[in-house]
């Protein structure tokens, strides 16, 4: 058998299975490679072995070689340590973005090239086009499944060596293809959540690595409402898991996280889902990454997402001298969260993005610039 020109990242899911099937149907010399990115920690919840068996089965049906690589060490140092540091600092990271940049489109690409392949293919809902002398990252045709948000840190060399075979497909059509092709993953449930946590309780998992420290939950006026198990378990806008019972003199309505003071170990909540304390029209980012290697201009208009699957929000972007971004939105944004990814778009094209550093939300701004009085908001 000739050396495969393309190595497909087979995850054991239906998306990568159909990606491999499409390339095989095109007569492309391919092989499959399964990446183990998380070592079994003894919890009994690691899904990697089941996924690996499914990946082997798919490669068997397609009649293509199967390879295995353990990238758990690279994942730990390149993704998980950053994940823990961000949570410890009170921010909410996005490990999927780092996993794509540091593992799937770095170590996997290198492993494929070491096997003699020219490029890799994955089951991401995204598209690549070569326009104007540059490689462009485009949204997937299925807007509900589009994964360009998680791929915005990719660059020219990575896109030049990457295929997204299912980028033009709708999920419903992909399922039908998988069933008609007899792929053993055709009915497999889509994976959700953070890959290394799986179905486990998030607090229990995080508590293994970050010692919990209980503290006060306060309302915006500084009144003690309840007690929390650790501020890093919560993110802005969150409702679930606060376990705030009836509070004397307060309506029987849900509470929402509106601020975190990691230094004083205080969590701030409000009963208004759209509290003014959660609203921001401006954000500052860390250093930005541009898919084509450079921004469109020093100042330009585009649309942005500050969380996955968020509707596009019109904004104006100003590139600072140090490469960071100042972004002004046309209308207020709810719960823009430091540590999450800001991703910028021009129509179908993903321009790039950056990690959100700060916003002008009233409570966040006051917490960042004061010594934390007992009454945070007058």
Swiss-Prot record:
The ranges of region (Interaction with target base in tRNA) come to 94-96
Annotated GO MF terms:
ATP binding; tRNA binding; tRNA-uridine 2-sulfurtransferase activity
| The UniProt record lists the keyword Protein transport | no
The principal location of this protein is cytoplasm
Q: Which cysteines are joined by disulfide bonds?
A: 99-195
Superkingdom as given in the UniProt entry: Bacteria
| Enzyme Commission code | 2.8.1.13
Designated name of the protein: tRNA-specific 2-thiouridylase MnmA
């Amino acid at each position: 058998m000739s050396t495969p020109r393309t190595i497909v990242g087979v995850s054991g899911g239906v998306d990568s299975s159909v990606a491999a099937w499409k390339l095989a149907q095109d007569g492309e010399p391919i092989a499959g490679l399964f990446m183990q990115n998380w070592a079994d920690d003894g919890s009994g919840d690691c899904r990697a072995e089941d996924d690996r068996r499914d990946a082997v089965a798919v490669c068997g049906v397609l009649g293509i070689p199967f390879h295995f690589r353990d990238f758990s060490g690279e994942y730990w140092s390149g993704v998980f340590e950053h994940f823990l540091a961000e949570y410890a600092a009170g921010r909410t990271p996005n490990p999927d973005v780092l996993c794509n940049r540091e593992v799937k489109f770095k170590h996997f690409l290198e492993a494929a090239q070491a096997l003699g392949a020219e490029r890799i293919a994955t089951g991401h809902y995204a598209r690549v086009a070569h326009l104007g002398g540059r490689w462009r990252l485009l949204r997937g045709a299925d807007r509900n499944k589009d994964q360009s948000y998680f791929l915005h840190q990719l660059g020219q060399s990575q896109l030049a060596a990457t295929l997204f075979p299912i980028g033009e497909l709708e999920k419903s059509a992909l399922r039908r293809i998988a069933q008609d092709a007899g792929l053993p993953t055709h009915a497999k449930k889509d994976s959700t959540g953070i890959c290394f946590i799986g179905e486990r309780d998030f607090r229990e998992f995080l508590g293994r690595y970050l010692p919990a420290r209980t503290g006060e939950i306060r309302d915006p006026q500084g009144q003690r409402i309840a007690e929390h198990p650790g501020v890093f378990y919560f993110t802005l806008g969150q409702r679930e898991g606060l376990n705030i019972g009836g509070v004397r003199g307060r309506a029987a309505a849900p509470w929402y996280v509106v601020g975190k003071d990691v230094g004083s170990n205080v969590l701030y909540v409000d009963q208004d889902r759209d509290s003014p304390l959660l609203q921001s029209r401006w954000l500052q980012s860390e250093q930005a990454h541009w898919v084509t290697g450079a921004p469109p201009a020093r100042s330009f208009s585009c649309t942005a997402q500050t969380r996955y699957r968020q509707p596009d929000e019109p904004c104006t972007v100003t590139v600072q001298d140090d490469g960071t971004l100042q972004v002004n939105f046309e209308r207020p944004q709810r719960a823009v969260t430091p540590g999450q990814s800001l991703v910028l778009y021009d129509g179908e094209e993903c321009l790039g993005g950056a990690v959100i550093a700060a916003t002008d939300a009233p409570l966040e701004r006051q917490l960042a610039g004061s010594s934390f009085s007992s009454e945070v908001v007058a």
